[in-house]
Amino acid sequence: MDQRFIALLKKFNYSCDSVIFQFIRYTQPGWLFNLRPTIEEDFASCYIPEENIDPAFLDITYETHTARLADAGYRLWCKGVLLESNTNEIKNISAEKPGLQDEYIFIRKYWGNAWAYYTLLIRLFTFKNPVNEINHFFKTRYIKKIDVFDSPIMYPAYENFYSELIATTPKVAVIIPTLNRYTYLKDVLHDLEQQTYKNFEVLVFDQSDDFQPEFYTQFQLDIKITKQVEKKLWTARNNAIKSTTASYLLFFDDDSRVGSDWISEHLKCIDFFNCDISAGVSLAVTGQKISKSYAYFRWADQFDSGNAMVKRDVFKKIGLFDEQFNGMRMGDGEFAYR
């Protein structure tokens, strides 16, 4: 695991010890749901206590019982079960780690043979015992990859859920940093004009070389324009957060398109699941097929700063975006780790 990433985990009070398979660091090095906080608190996790699992759900292909439980937890997490654990619950699970054969089963089952070969090569080049590695690699060659995102857990009550949060009409601030993209921004603001939820303001931090304040007069929106001389994305977002008293902050990109229920759906999600962040996803191309893993509710394993609603209290607790990431794309990733 990258030493910078380990330092980041320690900064945020996370143990670098995985509560499931160690090999996940090769396929999902930034995935935090397999780690445990070093402080006593409840946390989102892929660990499921043994008393909460049907024995029939366990995969007996694994050699160790720990691996069977870890596999079940990972599978349920991927299918949309919102698992939570606390530090006390998982103190004892480190007694028996999944063996090397179990690790290769896990890789083949969820990522396939190509990733198994990749993992083997990494471990051989990092001076792991070649006899053990090759032996367990070939012992697991019969394992077939599964579609873990098939048959997800659904939340049917969501469709007809009456949101008291929406009924109270809290103020929402839609935050848009922009740079030389007036052509795309026109569509963005037109989409916001069509929103069914009305109590929102639009905060545009315009860093364009040819600043055009008259461009914004065509829109029927509560829109506040700030000309920012510095071309700094995370500074713009932080300045927007500091400039508003809105209870909910909705981050948007200057080249995205959304439906008319975009704001209301984010609020409804926060209300239904009693969560602090509603993390949407962004598709690179209009009309692009949505990945199976994005088609249902689950714990978010990424924070898309172009489509996410955050309670203001979150920033009060953990701070603003780190402006050291100006000029880079990982400002939202670092925020997500926190």
Each language-model region and where it sits:
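A recurrent flexible, glycine/aromatic-enriched loop bordering the glycosyltransferase active site
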Residues: 14-18, 23-50, 292-310, 326-328, ...
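Short aromatic/hydrophobic "clamp" motif used to bind/position activated sugar donors
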Residues: 249
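Acidic donor-binding loop at a coil-to-helix junction in glycosyltransferase catalytic cores
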Residues: 63-71, 328-335
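Acidic donor-binding segment of Leloir-type glycosyltransferases
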Residues: 189-227
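Conserved donor NDP-sugar-binding/catalytic core segment of glycosyltransferases
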Residues: 1-24, 257-293
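Active-site-adjacent helix/loop segment of glycosyltransferases
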Residues: 79-145
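Glycine-rich, basic loop-to-helix element that forms the pyrophosphate-binding segment
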Residues: 228-244, 294-295
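N-proximal low-complexity "stem/linker" segments adjacent to membrane-targeting elements
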Residues: 135-191
